[in-house]
Amino acid sequence: MARSRSISGYGIWKYLNPAYYLRRPRRLALLFIVFVSVSMLVWDRINLAREHEVEVFKLNEEVSRLEQMLEELNGGVGNKPLKTLKDAPEDPVDKQRRQKVKEAMIHAWSSYEKYAWGKDELQPRTKDGTDSFGGLGATMVDSLDTLYIMGLDEQFQKAREWVASSLDFDKDYDASMFETTIRVVGGLLSAYDLSGDKMFLEKAKDIADRLLPAWNTPTGIPYNIINLRNGNAHNPSWAAGGDSILADSGTEQLEFIALSQRTGDPKYQQKVEKVITELNKNFPADGLLPIYINPDNANPSYSTTTFGAMGDSFYEYLLKVWVQGNKTSAVKPYRDMWEKSMKGLLSLVKKSTPSSFTYICEKNGNNLIDKMDELACFAPGMLALGASGYGPDEEKKFLSLAGELAWTCYNFYQSTPTKLAGENYFFTAGQDMSVGTSWNILRPETVESLFYLWRLTGNKTYQEWGWNIFQAFEKNSRVESGYVGLKDVNTGAKDNKMQSFFLAETLKYLYLLFSPSSVISLDEWVFNTEAHPLKIVARNDPRKPTIALRQRKFGHQINV
């Protein structure tokens, strides 16, 4: 019995001894076959798990597509098209104004091309460039879709060649998640959706992959700064207690969802969806969140609540992800969160005296602060865009509020000697508004809202206001070598920077303000917060976006 156990033990161990196989070639071959088979089995299981994840993503896409079809058959209210202005015979004045805006873009681009080619931004007064975003070609990438929409083919192709041959993201640079996503990922995806050029999609995937480690936190709420080379992520040193910033953490959804749709890889969408899922767990009844969020436990910090800096685009993206998903049931949670936030916005609305300017306060704790950033002037456009999802009475109420806020924002411009708005305004009883921070850096938010309101109401007053703002830029900001901001809107003293968003947003929205509504139709495109249009595709719909071809004359979009 003992011997039997001994022999049995020897019989097991001899097969584990390499010498046993080395003396017998056939057995060595057998060992090799077993090794290869086991390796293939393990590798196959890894691949199978990955394929299963992708397959589940595609199945969810198909389910959502079928749900969308059912909603359309049932005539779902939430999926009704926007009441956008129908194209009519072109007003000659609109054509002339559109051409003037196009000429402004040519002047801005030619100056960048001459003095700062490949740099992030142009410094017009010193006629050189600066890499304010680590050398990511911010102006180049930000301008791609504007050039395309305006029909500036030669300039677009030259920029395309630079992106293909010279844009390199392998940099030891601590990048802002927010800025890199909205400018670079958004700009590249928009260029892809417009042109169909897959090079842009590959570049977008490259930079997005470098940003992904920022979401590796206990809650999935991302750190807001990441090194593009080594993936080390952290929050800005000046942020309260090392917290993440609300807008910086909730303004990647449009771009990363679009990237998953275009590539078929769910990982991008999964990262950004988890953020909203986490925030929705304890989303307040008024839908208002402070500007600082702890990435370890998702708790908001006691801090300012605002529709201005560091809060703004979080609320914008709740609405626009719903629009991007074609307003189907798959994206209804975003709409629900946004409607809660609009109840909160109403609680912040006040009127000045004596002129009854409607404005949006900031809030600190339970205290309202009578201050409104020019950045918050995106809100009229957001309200107009979202109004159609309500019933008739609520739609009318929110459109009316949008118009009142737009009038206030327009008067931010009209109330200064240069007719350009300051950075923020304070409201004092009996004195209406007074400029606080007095610089103007060529921001787009007011003309953005005028664009939406004109498209959705057909009221040409908004075009007139936009034209007046454009003329003020031409008078005060245009210089021989580009456009500059103002250090002070009261004195007209100039700075030395042409912000990339002036080409990406301000000039694009002004151009579209005087273009037919078929040019980047709001029923077919959704703009990210940097004004990069992304094709609307039903959430999880496996169908690729229809690429639009351009009429050469005006840059009109025609679906084929």
UniProtKB/Swiss-Prot annotation:
<dbReference type="GO" id="GO:0005975">
    <property type="term" value="P:carbohydrate metabolic process"/>
</dbReference>
<dbReference type="GO" id="GO:0005802">
    <property type="term" value="C:trans-Golgi network"/>
</dbReference>
<protein>
    <recommendedName>
        <fullName>Mannosyl-oligosaccharide 1,2-alpha-mannosidase MNS1</fullName>
        <ecNumber>3.2.1.113</ecNumber>
        <ecNumber>3.2.1.209</ecNumber>
    </recommendedName>
</protein>
<feature type="topological domain" description="Cytoplasmic">
    <location>
        <begin position="1"/>
        <end position="27"/>
    </location>
</feature>
<feature type="disulfide bond">
    <location>
        <begin position="377"/>
        <end position="409"/>
    </location>
</feature>
<feature type="active site">
    <location>
        <position position="312"/>
    </location>
</feature>
<dbReference type="GO" id="GO:0000139">
    <property type="term" value="C:Golgi membrane"/>
</dbReference>
<feature type="transmembrane region" description="Helical; Signal-anchor for type II membrane protein">
    <location>
        <begin position="28"/>
        <end position="47"/>
    </location>
</feature>
<feature type="glycosylation site" description="N-linked (GlcNAc...) asparagine">
    <location>
        <position position="459"/>
    </location>
</feature>
<keyword id="KW-0106">Calcium</keyword>
<keyword id="KW-0460">Magnesium</keyword>
<feature type="active site">
    <location>
        <position position="445"/>
    </location>
</feature>
<dbReference type="GO" id="GO:0005768">
    <property type="term" value="C:endosome"/>
</dbReference>
<dbReference type="InterPro" id="IPR001382">
    <property type="entry name" value="Glyco_hydro_47"/>
</dbReference>
<feature type="coiled-coil region">
    <location>
        <begin position="47"/>
        <end position="80"/>
    </location>
</feature>
<dbReference type="GO" id="GO:0004559">
    <property type="term" value="F:alpha-mannosidase activity"/>
</dbReference>
<dbReference type="GO" id="GO:0004571">
    <property type="term" value="F:mannosyl-oligosaccharide 1,2-alpha-mannosidase activity"/>
</dbReference>
<keyword id="KW-0479">Metal-binding</keyword>
<keyword id="KW-0378">Hydrolase</keyword>
<keyword id="KW-0325">Glycoprotein</keyword>
<keyword id="KW-1133">Transmembrane helix</keyword>
<dbReference type="GO" id="GO:0006486">
    <property type="term" value="P:protein glycosylation"/>
</dbReference>
<comment type="similarity">
    <text>Belongs to the glycosyl hydrolase 47 family.</text>
</comment>
<dbReference type="InterPro" id="IPR036026">
    <property type="entry name" value="Seven-hairpin_glycosidases"/>
</dbReference>
<dbReference type="Pfam" id="PF01532">
    <property type="entry name" value="Glyco_hydro_47"/>
</dbReference>
<dbReference type="InterPro" id="IPR012341">
    <property type="entry name" value="6hp_glycosidase-like_sf"/>
</dbReference>
<dbReference type="GO" id="GO:0005794">
    <property type="term" value="C:Golgi apparatus"/>
</dbReference>
<keyword id="KW-0175">Coiled coil</keyword>
<dbReference type="GO" id="GO:0000137">
    <property type="term" value="C:Golgi cis cisterna"/>
</dbReference>
<keyword id="KW-0472">Membrane</keyword>
<dbReference type="InterPro" id="IPR050749">
    <property type="entry name" value="Glycosyl_Hydrolase_47"/>
</dbReference>
<feature type="glycosylation site" description="N-linked (GlcNAc...) asparagine">
    <location>
        <position position="326"/>
    </location>
</feature>
<comment type="pathway">
    <text>Protein modification; protein glycosylation.</text>
</comment>
<feature type="binding site">
    <location>
        <position position="529"/>
    </location>
    <ligand>
        <name>Ca(2+)</name>
    </ligand>
</feature>
<dbReference type="GO" id="GO:0005509">
    <property type="term" value="F:calcium ion binding"/>
</dbReference>
<feature type="active site" description="Proton donor">
    <location>
        <position position="179"/>
    </location>
</feature>
<keyword id="KW-0812">Transmembrane</keyword>
<keyword id="KW-1015">Disulfide bond</keyword>
<comment type="function">
    <text>Class I alpha-mannosidase essential for early N-glycan processing. Progressively trims alpha-1,2-linked mannose residues. Produces Man(5)GlcNAc(2) from Man(8)GlcNAc(2), but only Man(6)GlcNAc(2) from Man(9)GlcNAc(2). Has difficulty acting on the terminal mannose of the b-branch. Involved in root development and cell wall biosynthesis.</text>
</comment>
<dbReference type="GO" id="GO:0006491">
    <property type="term" value="P:N-glycan processing"/>
</dbReference>
<keyword id="KW-0735">Signal-anchor</keyword>
<feature type="topological domain" description="Lumenal">
    <location>
        <begin position="48"/>
        <end position="560"/>
    </location>
</feature>
